[in-house]
Amino acid sequence: MNKMERQQQIKRIIQAEHIGTQEDIKNHLQKEGIVVTQATLSRDLREIGLLKLRDEQGKLYYSLSEHVATPFSPEVRFYVLKVDRAGFMLVLHTNLGEADVLANLIDNDAIEDILGTIAGADTLLVICRDEEIAKRFEKDLAAGL
């Protein structure tokens, strides 16, 4: 089985089941005769662009990113470690030296409701158009953590 076929199978599993962990995905693949290493599975999930969301009971589950309306690219989500909100502003935390990279990604995405960004070494201030938009973006980014 090649990479594309394996990733299609992963997408099918995610759409059919409420899957919460990579181990669950790996077990489903094994039941179908597909053996993958943890590293390969992690890479596949990142390339597919899966999001982790919370259901009504607060349990995490994987979802295909095309099923969730999000203005943020998978690259943006990759850098965010933590998100906090203060009114109409978001504070995004990254690894040391990555905040400016994240700022450039967000600025290049040209999201209409983001007025601007200010980056430090590991912290990024995102200024949103209003508080409701900031709340929505906070929820969106936190779901991917």
UniProtKB/Swiss-Prot annotation:
SUPFAM superfamilies membership: C-terminal domain of arginine repressor, Winged helix' DNA-binding domain
GO MF: arginine binding; DNA binding; DNA-binding transcription factor activity
Pathway: Amino-acid biosynthesis; L-arginine biosynthesis [regulation]
First-listed, main subcellular location of the protein, grouped into a coarse class: cytoplasm
GO annotation, cellular component aspect: cytoplasm
Keywords: Amino-acid biosynthesis, Arginine biosynthesis, Cytoplasm, DNA-binding, Repressor, Transcription, Transcription regulation
Gene3D superfamilies in alphabetical order: 3.30.1360.40, Winged helix-like DNA-binding domain superfamily/Winged helix DNA-binding domain (1.10.10.10)
Top-level taxon of the source organism: Bacteria
Pfam families cross-referenced by the UniProt entry: Arg_repressor (PF01316), Arg_repressor_C (PF02863)
Subcellular location: Cytoplasm
Transmembrane portions of the chain: none
One GO BP annotation of this record: L-arginine biosynthetic process
Alphabetized HAMAP family for the sequence: Arg_repressor
The family this protein is said to belong to: Belongs to the ArgR family.
Role description: Regulates arginine biosynthesis genes.
Name listed for the protein in its UniProt record: Arginine repressor
Species annotation: Streptococcus pyogenes serotype M6 (strain ATCC BAA-946 / MGAS10394)
